[in-house]
UniProtKB/Swiss-Prot annotation:
GO cellular component: cytosol
Tagged with keyword Cytoplasm: yes
InterPro entries assigned: Cytidylate_kin, Cytidylate_kinase_dom, P-loop_NTPase
Class of the enzyme per the UniProt entry, highest EC level: transferase
Any one GO molecular-function label of the UniProt entry: CMP kinase activity
Taxonomic lineage: Bacteria, Pseudomonadati, Pseudomonadota, Betaproteobacteria, Burkholderiales
Subcellular location field: Cytoplasm
Protein name per its UniProtKB record: Cytidylate kinase
Domain of life: Bacteria
Classification via SUPFAM superfamilies: P-loop containing nucleoside triphosphate hydrolases
Length: 228
């Protein structure tokens, strides 16, 4: 049955989920297939986290972090994430930066400072946005909301492979522990906790290939009467 959700002139597909659930890869491929813009909201938080490390701002100092985020010069060009004009695409994928990003994301003031930046990505012909609160907070009027899940073991294996391919050292047991801690922190924080939107479609990717996951999202989009 087709959705009766009213269409915004610029449609948004949100793909939320926990760390290493595959949402970033799926979102990028869906966006490429549809010719839509892409928002990797996690990259914004990682850029803020990297800046906090560089400028020695403590992760529990919410006011200082919000002030830092307000003044950051962040750009995305040709798939590269730039901080103050320097490409830091690889640097922000380090585990230490990811852990710091999860730690600073608990602060409502930090999340508020990044809301406008995220919503500004909504441009014609459309947007695919991935993150943790895209469907619940940033784009509640999205035409399609997907919540990706996967077992923590599958996610740790994926994360280990990603890190090794990028030249980072990684221990699978440490990754399992980090993921469990991040899941607890993300799900229990007061500001925009990680949870599926009430109208989100759940997609467990534990036993799915990337291609199968992408095709399922596109199939749901086609069910809305949209060309995909």
């Amino acid at each position: 049955m087709k959705s009766t959700r009213p269409f915004h002139p610029t449609p948004v597909i949100t793909i939320d989920g926990p760390t290493a659930s595959g949402k970033g890869t799926v979102a990028a491929l869906v966006a490429a297939h549809l010719g839509f813009h892409l928002l990797d909201s996690g990259a914004l938080y990682r850029l803020a986290a990297l800046a906090s490390i560089r400028y020695q701002v403590e992760p529990d100092d919410a006011d200082a972090l919000a002030s830092l985020v307000d003044g950051l010069h962040i750009t995305f060009r040709e798939g590269c994430a730039q901080l103050d004009g320097v490409d830091v695409s690889d640097e922000i994928r380090a585990e230490a930066v990811g852990n710091r990003a999860s730690a600073i994301a608990v602060h409502a003031s930090v999340r508020a400072a990044l809301v406008a930046r995220q919503r500004a990505f909504r441009k014609t012909p459309g947007l695919v946005a991935d993150g943790r609160d895209m469907g619940t907070l940033i784009f509640p009027d999205a035409v399609l909301k997907v919540f990706l899940t996967a077992s923590v073991e599958a996610r740790a294996a994926r994360r280990h492979k990603q890190l090794m391919q990028k030249g980072f050292s990684a221990n699978i047991d440490n990754l399992l522990q980090d993921l469990r801690e991040r899941d607890a922190r993300d799900s229990n924080r007061a500001a925009a906790p990680l949870k599926p939107a009430a109208d989100a479609k759940p997609l467990d990717t534990s036993a799915l290939t990337i291609e199968q996951s992408v095709e399922q999202v596109l199939a749901w989009y086609r069910e809305l009467g949209q060309p995909a």
